[in-house]
Amino acid sequence: MERIKELRNLMSQSRTREILTKTTVDHMAIIKKYTSGRQEKNPSLRMKWMMAMKYPITADKRITEMIPERNEQGQTLWSKMNDAGSDRVMVSPLAVTWWNRNGPMTSTVHYPKIYKTYFEKVERLKHGTFGPVHFRNQVKIRRRVDINPGHADLSAKEAQDVIMEVVFPNEVGARILTSESQLTITKEKKEELQDCKISPLMVAYMLERELVRKTRFLPVAGGTSSVYIEVLHLTQGTCWEQMYTPGGEVRNDDVDQSLIIAARNIVRRAAVSADPLASLLEMCHSTQIGGTRMVDILRQNPTEEQAVDICKAAMGLKISSSFSFGGFTFKRTSGSSVKREEEMLTGNLQTLKIRVHEGYEEFTMVGKRATAILRKATRKLIQLIVSGRDEQSIAEAIIVAMVFSQEDCMIKAVRGDLNFVNRANQRLNPMHQLLRHFQKDAKVLFQNWGIEHIDNVMGMIGVLPDMTPSTEMSMRGVRVSKMGVDEYSSAERVVVSIDRFLRVRDQRGNVLLSPEEVSETQGTEKLTITYSSSMMWEINGPESVLVNTYQWIIRNWETVKIQWSQNPTMLYNKMEFEPFQSLVPKAIRGQYSGFVRTLFQQMRDVLGTFDTTQIIKLLPFAAAPPKQSRMQFSSLTVNVRGSGMRILVRGNSPVFNYNKTTKRLTILGKDAGTLTEDPDEGTSGVESAVLRGFLILGKEDRRYGPALSINELSNLAKGEKANVLIGQGDVVLVMKRKRDSSILTDSQTATKRIRMAIN
């Protein structure tokens, strides 16, 4: 107060004001502060002070020929005085206004192309909807987020090469454009930017925005995709939030979202196959997301999610060193531990063999809806500070931390037997057994944990076993906080190894990820995911399996046909027929298979006729291990659309319908493709006419001597076999019919069989 009075007193004297306003500042320290270094110390003041001058801008001398000396109002636009220290002229801000209104027009065609990201942002905001503002405490946690909507996913180096190639194509310097995306973008941009007058530097900056993912570590409550992050300043403050729905989506968010869905589907499917790692790699390599190969996306996309990281590990890529348990990402922030196998008894006296972490450690736990800080010693939870969106999310985090602590009271809280299995029907490891058990019901766990009196600490509150908040008591060591726990900020990646059961370990052998950690959440992908692997046919249900199986046969008919006649066993064992087996009722699979294989053998041998449609239709049934029985079937059942549907052995059905005139096959009403050769061709060429009374058995067989001409055939006795030369110099093996009754069919059969034998 005294100082203020003193100052007021000083100011009331007229001389003081004069001294302060008129005297020059010549204190050395001040002069030094504002003049040393090239960095402007007070930019906004400098700007205001400059703009208050009459001619704050300098311009090239040529401007005096392009701009009049005075505008319509008679105000001077430029000074006749030269700028001190350069040969430029001094210009008034009014000159800029004049130029904007009356200056030359240039073509604006390139602007939307160069400033694409800005134009798109304006569109998104224009069509976005802002909802009401709510005032409430915001639990924000820092997460690494994408701040640049609408970008491709090139690495900085790849983008640099593309930019140099597009903007400065004639500059010297080694540039290697290797990836498909690099080449596509370069070609596209070169075409777009022909005759572009915008400065190359500006073009380069804007291209960088379009090509590279930029991430920042920002406090976020709510959506983390880039279209939300670009309006972060509008949607959440310290004590308020505003609802917002983006007015458009961007490809990079869609890629991230679709990649997670594809990876989850692939890991879940691989986990139940005979060789999970090989299957996973096969699927990753044969899958496309939005038209781009999944493996290319995995190499470039930094998304960290359990399934995505398992796929990356399988491809030998580095991943984050944090590990996953119970859907939370754990990152050790201090301490260390050694692992030791220990046997313990549950409350149900079941023995569990658990790898115990011995030593003091601190972790951050980050989940989708809750975060926590955990301090633990050997089999002891010391402290857990949780924050989350709601009671349910907080409870989830507490359960995971309690199981992770490996405390005895947690193991003793198990009621009943632990026998949880994974998708492949294998028992889960003990830690996941415990986790599943308590996720189902944590009442006993919370009740047995113990409670304690708590001190009043700002921003922290206790939580009771029934999850109600309390200021006096809390479950032992557990507190709920208003503040979130930040995600681990470092983006370091480490080399990992993966075993055939998809368990990912760091170099010290700690398990970072396993298929148990992959979320079961189902979502709908934003971009089309094309799984070419037959293992993924069942992802869209039984109908998809049916259609895909038959489409595969039709697409590969040429090779299938040859295998059918020469090496059927190999054909029956093809993995493409595996998914189909799940559609055939278990009890009858073996009989169907035996029946179809016998039928096929008859076709190959003497009796009956070769019928393409029938082979295609029945082939998938022959893949199951056959049971020998004398049973005959006129129709075979498949389980689709919630019930058994019939496929007729001879003739069409709603499930399998072949149209002879259009040559199109429809499965359950869906188009399954065209057969290139018509199975029931009635063309009787010379051969079929002459070969009436003979059965074509297959390719030439040298044991039956040199090829006869068609005319020499008449000398054969019934049942005798011979090689015969037909049509275009091809040789086939034939046999003279024993009975004349079947002669009629021969001319139709012959054409087909000749074609089969030749091919």
From Swiss-Prot:
Record-linked InterPro entries: Flu_PB2_2nd (IPR049110), Flu_PB2_6th (IPR049114), Flu_PB2_C (IPR049115), Flu_PB2_CAP-bd (IPR048298), Flu_PB2_middle (IPR049111), Flu_PB2_N (IPR049106), INV_PB2 (IPR001591), PB2_helical (IPR049113)
CC annotations in GO: host cell mitochondrion; host cell nucleus; virion component
Site (Mammalian adaptation): 627
Domain of life: Viruses
SUPFAM superfamilies, alphabetized: PB2 C-terminal domain-like
Cystine connections: none
Localization per Swiss-Prot or TrEMBL: Virion; Host nucleus; Host mitochondrion
BP GO annotations: 7-methylguanosine mRNA capping; cap snatching; DNA-templated transcription; symbiont-mediated suppression of host cytoplasmic pattern recognition receptor signaling pathway via inhibition of MAVS activity; symbiont-mediated suppression of host gene expression; symbiont-mediated suppression of host mRNA transcription via inhibition of RNA polymerase II activity; viral RNA genome replication
Signal peptide extent: none
Subunit structure: Influenza RNA polymerase is composed of three subunits: PB1, PB2 and PA. Interacts (via N-terminus) with PB1 (via C-terminus). Interacts with nucleoprotein NP (via N-terminus). Interacts (via N-terminus) with host MAVS (via N-terminus); this interaction inhibits host innate immune response.
Functional summary from the UniProt entry: Plays an essential role in transcription initiation and cap-stealing mechanism, in which cellular capped pre-mRNAs are used to generate primers for viral transcription. Recognizes and binds the 7-methylguanosine-containing cap of the target pre-RNA which is subsequently cleaved after 10-13 nucleotides by the viral protein PA. Plays a role in the initiation of the viral genome replication and modulates the activity of the ribonucleoprotein (RNP) complex.
Protein name (record): Polymerase basic protein 2
